[in-house]
């Protein structure tokens, strides 16, 4: 009942913001601090921040929170060093900024690559949404994915960035309130904080784990997350689009700082739920629907939720749904925006009217949602979906390396940038495919696709800029 009410409320808010939406308002225009924070936070607090981090909490402990902390550090990096530059350029998309630095050719290449990135990430959110509906409502996955996609697309098409900002305000509140309430109730139920820490310390002494250590998950994983977030935060269209739509530069910078502060702590709460699940599992009180003790971290959040009172359990479900909704909508909007601004308006119809752009924006946004849905249905049973998504994130971060060259080095040029971005895309995909086929990374176990993509971008941009030493006008 709580979930159905939440669905209806989300649609109503999205539809109410649709009245009189112009092309500029659809993509975002003159947003204030609160609107930017709520719209941007959705990019960083998706399904992985709930189910994924709770799984890390179950297995590794509180160090699983590094996932959202890394995202917060990335947004803070954007605030301190690039929010002012980006906003002063006055473009609505990352490819638009790349065009400002390198020219049209680089804009087209980057827009194609970043649209692919957005669609890959959007596909993962549709998979999460489909599985959510499958587990909660007993629907066939395909039906669940289609229904959720229709909901995402409907309210995003209705109000664009206005709808995303308005609905994400509600999503953000529900996520924090639902998860925080659950954490408090669960720890009190275990006998309070001292009893909780004592129980997990006993488990650690028996199993040789360190659930209360921030380093237990390992430096390679943490460093990979931090590097990907520092670079990716500066090229994440879904997270940056509200910033580019801010009313002025001080608003953009302030909103980024607040977004970082909102994003970073969330993983601490969901990791704690995973740790509670570990304690309950060791005590034999965390069981699945068949009565078997849960030992799989992937089931931690759902299984713990089933032990809560119905209303609180409904709030946690709503929080999980809010995390998915808050990410999926800005992602398909970002893909539609880049297709419209950086391909249609820049290449196909340079003199398009505002009415034409609004129409095309809605069509491309809807098509982005449909493509994500088809991809989700096709790949739901593929065990390598997360590898594909991480490859997309790595490519996004590597593109920022190319952009940095353009800001800081006079010899960086359009031809070098275009070829470098293509090479980086090929290397990123190859690195993931190699791991899928062989079960291990090329070169070294710690040399993930993040390092491979960044290294390729840095080296190829340096060499090619020296070879092609004239910047495109």
Q: Predicted regions span which residues?
A:
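Membrane-embedded helix-loop-helix hairpins and adjacent transmembrane boundary segments
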Residues: 1-473
